[in-house]
Each structure stands twice: as C-alpha cells, then as structure tokens.
Swiss-Prot record:
Name used for this protein in its record: Alkaline proteinase inhibitor
Keywords: Disulfide bond, Metalloenzyme inhibitor, Metalloprotease inhibitor, Periplasm, Protease inhibitor, Signal
Organism taxonomic ancestry: Bacteria, Pseudomonadati, Pseudomonadota, Gammaproteobacteria, Enterobacterales
Residues in the signal sequence: 1-24
Organism field: Serratia marcescens
InterPro entries found in the cross-reference section: Inh (IPR022815), Inh/Omp19 (IPR021140), Protease_inh_b-brl_dom (IPR016085)
Gene3D superfamilies, alphabetized: 2.40.128.10
Molecular function in Gene Ontology: metalloendopeptidase inhibitor activity
Length: 124
C-alpha cells in the first residue's frame, strides 16, 4: 500500500511539473516583439500592415495600422491584433476573433476556405 501511494504521489508530482513546463513554454509574444512592418498576402495581392507596441486593453490586443485598408477589404471590419501562444489573432473592436494565423516557420498562415489562404510575415 505504501508503495502504491508513493508511486501515485510521484506520478501526480510528475504531472504537475509537466504542466508547469508545458505552460511555461507557451509564452505570449509581447506587443514590442510583434511591433513593426508586416506583409499580408494571398494568391492575388499583398500589402503592408504595421503592428504598434500600443496595447488595446478593451480588446486585449495590440494596435494595428492598415493604411492600405487591405484587411478591411478582406474582413469588412476594423481590425486589431492579438498574440496567441502559437500564432497571431486578428480581432474586431469588441475583442472577438476574425481570423487566426498559425505559426508556419518564419510566417503565419490562415486558411480561409478551400485553397484560399492568407499569410502574415514580418518584414526585416
């Protein structure tokens, strides 16, 4: 019985450590780390947007500047950005998610539908 409790305690302790390590590895990028010029592209066009280091507390996101109104034409809404542990979300003014871009190497990808995809890439 004592051995069973010891094994159970070790297993539970191991799960807690694993959870902490997993949670620690999924850090959210800061506004400063995403700040700068980015390119949004699909099969027909590409345009530049800019992430600013200003946080938007009402949406839990970061300020995004779309001077060419590229994203507004795709999503028909004002867009702000939000970071996720495994990608970047484009948010509406109320904080709801319009699109999520998953990390794919040095860029982020959003699959809109069958064959249609948007990519988001930081410009150096």
């Amino acid at each position: 019985m004592k051995g069973t409790l010891t094994r159970a305690a070790l297993a539970a302790g191991g799960m807690m450590v694993t959870s902490a390590v997993m949670a620690g590895s999924l850090a959210l990028p800061t506004a400063q780390s995403l700040a700068g010029q980015w390119e949004v592209a699909d099969s027909e066009r590409q345009c530049q947007i800019e992430f600013l280091a200003n946080e938007q507390s009402e949406t839990n996101g970061y300020q995004l500047v779309d001077r060419q109104r590229c994203l507004q034409s795709v999503f028909a809404a004002e867009v702000v950005a939000g970071a996720g542990p495994d990608g970047i979300a484009l948010l509406q003014a109320d904080g709801s998610t319009l699109a999520f871009f998953s990390r794919d190497g040095d860029l982020y990808r959003n699959q809109l539908g069958a064959g249609d995809a948007l990519t988001l890439k930081a410009l150096a």
